[in-house]
Amino acid sequence: MIGYYVHHHGLGHRNRATQIARELSVPVLGFSTLECPPDWPGEWVQLPPDTTDQPEDPTANGVLHWAPLGHPGHRERMGLLADRLRTDVDLMVTDTSAEVTLLARLMGVPTVVMAMRGDRTDRTHRAAYDAATALVAPWSAETAEPYWPEEWNRKTTFTGAISRFDAPVRDAAGVGRHPLQPATPASGTDVAEPPSGVVHRESVLVVWGRGGTVVGDADIAAARAATPGWRWTVRTPDAPSPDLWRELHEATVVVTHGGNNAVAELSAARVPAVVVAQPRPHDEQLATAAALDRAGICVGLEHWPSPADWPVLLERALTLGGQRWDVWRHGDGAHRAAAALETLLRGERP
């Protein structure tokens, strides 16, 4: 059995884990503070929260990221994980937690870390990445971090982007198919070609997530005012799109943050885009935006620009177009990740 730990910040980790889990042909057991997603294909253990406003030595003198002393929720969640690692789990995936990675490895269970962009060379990340049996990176080798240690690169499977709009490679009966064969869409998800009859207008679609942002309504209003002739539509978790796949294709340019899943959805739709990094630990979104801009895939920015910059940025996004998104994705990222996990489960190298 494969164990799969899912971090609770935002929903991106859970969405990605679900896409991968649905491609597995072996049992999978999820762990998270979050509730079980409706389409999770196996058992799910909901862990008690371990947050607190007044933690005592949560980093263990700088060795760990989060292990507060005397916290009953933290002790309970680690105990629940240890119980299943002892009895059921043969391979443990973490997306992502250095502490869970090290716990599994200390219990003699092979570990796989879902890698994240940004500077992960701090003491804690370095220990987790070094200790892991393998890493899975949801981006392409062509756009990989140039500063990663070679020992990480050697044990990394670069899957390309993993999007909920990717067609599943494993059909409902669990029978594998070649990635290029037609696929049956997941329930409630349109993974077809761009809708017929779509008329592209001078429009901007802003897609913003729930993971934390420094961009407010006033910033977007100022950008809108600075770009007459462009119609702006804003979608957030509080004002979701009724059909995001269609809206992505209807938009002339899409503006979004640098979160891994948001960018994966852009890549699936192959749309001209402006990706604006939001502050994240270890400069994760800065690294994503820089990689996109460096590869000439779309406009990647370090921060939300001034209103006067928006006309030029939108025109630059149109000039770049969406033709180079294939550098970022292969179209079967979840299947590639699942295949690597099953190979490791057999004791082989992917």
Predicted segments — roles?
Residues R77-L80, T233-A268:
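Donor nucleotide-activated moiety binding/catalytic core segment of transferases
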Residues N61-L91, D95-T101:
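Conserved nucleotide-sugar donor-binding subdomain of glycosyltransferases
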Residues A131-E202, V207-G212:
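A nucleotide-sugar donor-handling region in carbohydrate enzymes
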Residues H7-H8, V26-E76:
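Conserved nucleotide-sugar phosphate-binding/catalytic loop shared by glycosyltransferases and other
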Residues Y5-T18, V214:
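A short, glycine/small-residue-rich beta-strand->loop->alpha-helix junction that serves as a flexible
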Residues V263, S267-P311:
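Catalytic binding pocket for nucleotide-activated donors in carbohydrate/polymer assembly enzymes
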Residues V113, R126-A137, L248:
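A conserved, positively charged/aromatic
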Residues P311-P350:
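C-terminal amphipathic helix plus adjacent low-complexity
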